[in-house]
Amino acid sequence: EKETGTNLKWVATGTGKALKMGENCDVDVLLVHAPAAEKKLVESGFGIDRKEVVYNDFIIVGPIADPAHVSGKGTVEALKIIKDSKANFLSRGDDSGTHKKELSLWKDASQVIPETDLWYIQTGQGMLTTINMAAEKNGYTMTDRGTWIKYEAQKGADNKMKIVVEKDKTLFKQYSVIPVNKAKCPNVKLELAQSFSDWLIKPETQKFIGDFKLLDKTLFTPNASK
């Protein structure tokens, strides 16, 4: 706002709901992380000029005791072990980008999404709530690293969870900005949406994002120029 004079009104929601808001002409611009679904939005004509801007990664977290013994395993192997051991796994179950990614990983691991199994618990909640529920049920969940860092900051010494799977190439998480198409949604403030998109990829903005840390940990890595 200081640089452009544009006042942003954020709606924090999962990527699936965000993309639906774009199709319903309820927003001017989207910042989302489900590439396949994003490309469908652009192909449908509701999204334009998609730009990749930053990335972080997903991780699998679980109890410090790690009852399923998946620490250090690859993503697919870890999910197979969790399934075979029937350890509790908490899923957002909310059609968010994280949920979409998790489902794709279950398909890679077992060809079948374990939605009817008692150990597979769908919360229908956001990420922080889902991590908290996983801790309560001595279970595992998949989260983005940024939310995990926030969770660590909130819990401090009371944190009963730890990262068990990370830095697997299957866990990459790309964020993109997509203005909504004025031709489909006449009330869209396209100039302001485009201004925000252009601002996100500016070198100065990219540097600011890369330098921003919580608990001395980087939340997002800029990659608009890559």
Model-predicted segments: where are they?
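Serine endopeptidase catalytic core focused on the charge-relay Asp
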Residues: 60
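Acidic, polar ligand-binding/catalytic clefts
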Residues: 29-55
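Exported/periplasmic ABC-transporter solute-binding proteins
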Residues: 2-7, 16, 20, 26, ...
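Residue-level signal for tight coil/turn positions that link beta-strands
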Residues: 55-57, 86
